[in-house]
């Protein structure tokens, strides 16, 4: 076993050859490199599979013999300065390694088909390989400086992947927004690291925890300063894990390709913030005020993310806000000191949410054949509906992922979320009420997404089935708001959206490729005014096997991964507890290992009842009773069921505006920060251009004219120049004499 640990340092570097070789190949041998494009995807999957096998072996060793293995090398720069780097293997590291590699492999397989049409296929796999290297280096780091180095690399990879389609202005703005927002948190993290080093003199985790605890116990340092350093450290995870108030980048990050959303913004990158808080929990736990701040940020994020997801029409943005809310649950658990529950939910949520994102990608991929290659249309749920019979496998996988996130047993997220809700009851009644209420909201908005996407009929062709001759249709904006626009009665929407029916022009390149495998056509014959009308309609088709296979594997994880936290005997033994022995849990310090099954079933019944209530409300409001686009809006659904529609209209309008406008937080940042900074920049530019440059240029121009004047007075004679020079010197000294 010791021999195995000695080679753990190589884990982050195994996927690195792919981005290096791809980058060099595209620069030096572009044609040959592009001809081997499928080889690069296979190599990426193969290398990451090696890391996964290595990680599984390390995890088994951790379960058998729970230990911490650290190996550090020292790089001495001079007698007073040296830098230490190495690797740190413990149960937390093993969990993150398995999570990164399993989800990463499945996303790479999925991407091989999903990105096959894109001209940036090789660039995509180069970025993915570099991102995997950065994440693996982050979770195996042995000190804070090493973590910060890989933390920044992860941020850079996120910037590149979110802005992968950088020719689209929206994607370019989204990656800049993500980069700048994360820089705020990263700056705080750097200040916190430097502050802790100034106090403790060490960056190594074990030394840092020991020195930090001794300083607080012996009261040898200012507690306020340590609290400030701890909060600055926490700023990094706030930004990286999209916690309030630095959450604004996550929904915009959905402008990247869907596989990126599954890997970075569901399973790994946003989990990096949770990982760092879990890694530094022995440091945070001795400062009660910081623990309360962590739990407070978590509970605010839970509620905010859930409410913002209520009125989203873009399927990926709805899932993004769901991710934000679920990360809040993990942060709440860490703030309560429930280390095991937080990491358990990190695992279950990662697989369930990756399944949902890949499912949404399959839906988008199928819808693109119908509505064209515009995210405004292919991701908009108001143009979907009735996909059950067209994409049955995707529908089944998406439904089970939705039920898991809702907390329905025996799916994965039920077990972990139930633990967090139970622990919140012990921590704070107010926090428990908010957490339980948000569990109901989660079930509501997740089932809303499912119903709008799969139930009813395909809304793209709705006007053709309604039987009404309407002179208007609904133009869907980026956020899904319907704006009624007048059009010609003879205007045909379908041929425009199908883009010549048999070929789809890539949204990102002029090259076309066939999409026959993703579309089916049906001919409808109708009788109007005694004449036969023949029209052909196109419907989405189930995705290819290379897209479905990763979804089915993630479906198995969603079904069975919760078993690692289920007690296997009367003593309460389970795999997760064995892996985290000894673990931190402030809420169950004096509890025995025996499982109170009565209490478990009571709490589970309560949480499942809340989830079913949310599902029932969503079903009542969004089940399509009749064919009308108006039925898909939250407002009109409440009007139909409410006895007092005016009050409901005001309430739901307020809620809709809150969700649609992102709780006005983006607007606040735009008005108070962005526009203020731009005004300040314009004023500084004016001062620099007109005042600073004006003075400099004025001196130069004055000297020029004085020289020209002198030249004409002197008549180009040296004696005249000498006389003028001496006269000026005499006048200068005379002036000084007068002043004195």
Curated annotation (Swiss-Prot):
Gene Ontology CC annotation, any one: chloroplast thylakoid membrane
What are the transmembrane regions? 9-29, 40-60, 89-109, 125-145, 147-167, 185-205, 221-241, 258-278, 283-303, 327-347, 354-374, 396-416, 425-445, 547-567, 606-626, 718-738
Asked if Plastid is a keyword of the record, the answer is: yes
Checking InterPro entries in the record gives: NADH_UbQ_OxRdtase_chlpt_su5_C (IPR002128), NADHpl_OxRdtase_5_subgr (IPR018393), ND/Mrp_TM (IPR001750), NU5C-like (IPR003945), Proton_antipo_N (IPR001516)
User: Where's it mainly located?
Assistant: plastid
Protein known as: NAD(P)H-quinone oxidoreductase subunit 5, chloroplastic
**A Gene Ontology MF term for this entry?**
NADH dehydrogenase (ubiquinone) activity
The encoding gene is: ndhF
| Compartments where found | Plastid, Chloroplast thylakoid membrane
């Amino acid at each position: 076993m010791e021999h195995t640990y000695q080679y753990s340092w190589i884990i982050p570097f195994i996927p690195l050859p792919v981005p290096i070789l791809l980058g060099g190949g595209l620069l030096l041998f572009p044609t040959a490199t592009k001809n081997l494009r499928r080889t690069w995807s296979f190599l990426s999957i193969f290398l990451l599979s090696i890391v996964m096998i290595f990680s599984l072996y390390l995890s088994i060793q951790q379960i058998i013999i729970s230990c911490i293995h650290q190996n550090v090398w020292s790089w001495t720069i001079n007698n007073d300065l040296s830098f230490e780097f190495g690797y740190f293997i413990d149960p937390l590291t093993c969990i993150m390694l398995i999570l990164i590699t399993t989800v990463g492999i499945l996303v790479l397989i999925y991407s091989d088909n999903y990105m096959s049409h894109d001209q940036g296929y090789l660039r995509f796999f180069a970025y993915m390989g570099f991102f995997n290297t950065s994440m693996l280096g982050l979770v195996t780091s042995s000190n804070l400086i090493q973590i910060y180095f890989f933390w920044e690399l992860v941020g850079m990879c996120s910037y590149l992947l979110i802005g992968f389609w950088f020719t689209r202005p929206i994607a370019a703005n989204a990656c800049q927004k993500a980069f700048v927002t994360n820089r705020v948190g990263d700056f705080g993290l750097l200040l916190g690291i430097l502050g802790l080093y100034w106090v403790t003199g060490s960056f190594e985790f074990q030394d840092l925890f020991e020195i930090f605890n001794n300083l607080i116990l012996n009261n040898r340092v200012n507690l306020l300063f340590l609290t400030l350093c701890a909060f600055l450290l926490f700023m990094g995870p706030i930004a990286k894990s999209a916690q309030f108030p630095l959450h604004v980048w996550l929904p915009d990050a959905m402008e990247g390709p869907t596989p990126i959303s599954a890997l970075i913004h569901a399973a790994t990158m946003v989990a990096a913030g949770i990982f760092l808080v879990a890694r530094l929990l022995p440091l945070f736990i001795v400062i009660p005020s910081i623990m309360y701040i962590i739990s407070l940020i978590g509970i605010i994020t839970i509620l905010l993310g859930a409410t913002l997801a209520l009125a989203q029409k873009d399927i990926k943005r709805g899932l993004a806000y769901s991710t934000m809310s679920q990360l809040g649950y993990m942060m709440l658990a860490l703030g309560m000191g429930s280390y095991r529950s937080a990491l358990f939910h990190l695992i279950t949520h990662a697989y369930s949410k990756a399944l949902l994102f890949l499912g949404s990608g399959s839906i988008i991929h199928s819808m693109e054949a119908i509505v064209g290659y515009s995210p405004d249309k292919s991701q908009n749920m108001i143009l979907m509906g009735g996909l059950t019979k067209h994409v049955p496998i995707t529908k089944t996988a998406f439904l089970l992922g939705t039920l898991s996130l809702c907390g329905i047993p025996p799916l994965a997220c039920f077990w972990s979320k139930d633990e967090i809700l139970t622990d919140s009851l012990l921590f704070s009644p107010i926090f428990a009420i908010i957490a339980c209420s948000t569990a109901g909201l989660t079930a509501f908005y997740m089932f809303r997404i499912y119903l709008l996407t799969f139930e009813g009929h395909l809304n793209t062709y709705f006007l053709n089935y309604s039987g009404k001759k309407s002179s208007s249709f609904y133009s869907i904006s980026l956020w899904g708001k319907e704006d009624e626009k007048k059009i010609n009665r003879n205007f045909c929407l379908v041929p425009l959206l199908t883009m010549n029916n048999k070929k789809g022009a890539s949204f990102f390149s002029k090259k076309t490729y066939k999409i026959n495998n993703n579309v089916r056509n049906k001919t409808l014959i109708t009788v109007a005014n005694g004449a036969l009308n023949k029209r052909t309609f196109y419907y989405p088709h189930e995705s290819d096997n290379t897209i479905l296979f990763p979804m089915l594997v993630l479906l198995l994880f969603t079904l069975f991964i919760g078993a690692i936290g289920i007690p296997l005997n009367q003593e309460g033994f389970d795999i997760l507890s064995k892996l985290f022995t000894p673990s931190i849990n402030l809420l169950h310090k004096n509890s025995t290992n025996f499982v109170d099954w009565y209490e478990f079933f009571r709490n589970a019944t309560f949480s499942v009842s809340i989830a079913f209530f949310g599902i029932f409300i969503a079903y009542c409001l969004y089940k399509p009773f009749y064919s009308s686009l108006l039925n898909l809006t939250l407002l009109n659904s409440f009007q139909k069921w409410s006895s007092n529609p005016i009050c409901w209209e005001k309430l739901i309008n307020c809620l809709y505006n809150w969700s649609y406008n992102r709780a006005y937080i983006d607007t606040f940042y735009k008005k108070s920060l962005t526009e203020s900074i731009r005004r300040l920049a314009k004023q500084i530019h004016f001062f620099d251009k007109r005042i600073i440059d004006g003075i400099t240029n004025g001196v130069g121009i004055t000297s020029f004219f004085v020289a020209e004047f002198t030249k004409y007075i002197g008549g180009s004679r040296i004696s005249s120049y000498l006389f003028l020079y001496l006269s000026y010197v005499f006048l200068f000294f005379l002036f000084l004499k007068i002043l004195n």
